[in-house]
Amino acid sequence: MRRLKIILLAVIAVMGLNVHASELNAPVGVRPCCAFGVDLKAQLGSVPVPFFSLENVVDKGSVGDHHYNDGSASISGSLLGLADETNGLVFTKLGGFIDTAHVRDTADYTYYIFQLNQGYLGTSHHIDLPAELRLRRVTWHPQTQPLSKEQKITYSAEAAALTAFRLAQWHEIAQWFGMVSVGGFDELASAFSSEDLYSNMLGAHLAKQILIATPMLNTKQFSAAMDHALETALSELNAVTKSVTKEKIQQLDGIWWDSSKRLPNKWALIYRDYHLSLSLMPNYPTATHRLQLSETFDTNQPIEQWLSVSFIAADEEDAFDKLPSAIRTKSSWSSQDFQSLANYAEQVDKNAMSKLGIQAHKIKP
């Protein structure tokens, strides 16, 4: 009888997670932040926007309350600090520049996919996420290996973190190829920005740690846990004050970014990182804290044999017209194609910058 009760309780717990996952909406797009720079100006077409300046920097202790991104936060609220969440750039001595919007975006997707994993991990299933130039398809692959309750939680969190980060890598690629997602502006000035993917990976790590420790959190509880986790992470990375962050960015004017350019001009951003890896070092030379995500479970089985993401040709293939035919003609791309796409982007940018007389510099220690 006692064994039956334990089984029933386990079933009820799993059902509770599955019901929650079925009611949970995927994160809506991305938080509209942040091109690298400070006091950024904008223009609409050829007309500069008067009285507009985007400071783009937040204080280490004033990033606000995390909210699972269900789309309720306005663009102006996130950008201008009118929402409970305040996003922007923070300089840390160990992690370099951190974009809190990127941290939060990938944390939210890690949470979302973790919830889906409770019902689908080890089974045959797929879901389609809204297109970012290509349709984003998340696929679960059937497995025969039984998992204990603890293993399922760990596997679910690790697979969610990796998949969420893969989505972030794709977002950088889609930005470069001209995706438009915020207010009708393209995002060329943000594509492959040097702090982006490091920040995304930090978000994946924080969410993974939260979910392994406390897997039954609802969105409000997860958001509260992220508040503490982000605050702790910034402290451990030795985050500096808002004024120091601003000074650090201003010192890079003409090296990593160009204050004379107005958004959405692509060349407002000069220095980009096209290296797509699961092991990342900060681009700022004195920052030394490496972040890594594993491609395998502790059994050495590749995570993507359980859960993978693919990018399927949709209605915006003209964005990829100039790609070499060997990759352009593939109807589905996977993470294995990412570096080839990034290498192409890097070469195109090098050629364009050479013609424009723009030179990117790495900072000397």
Regions found by a protein language model. Give the residues of each.
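A glycine-rich, coil/turn loop motif that links secondary-structure elements
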Residues: 189-195
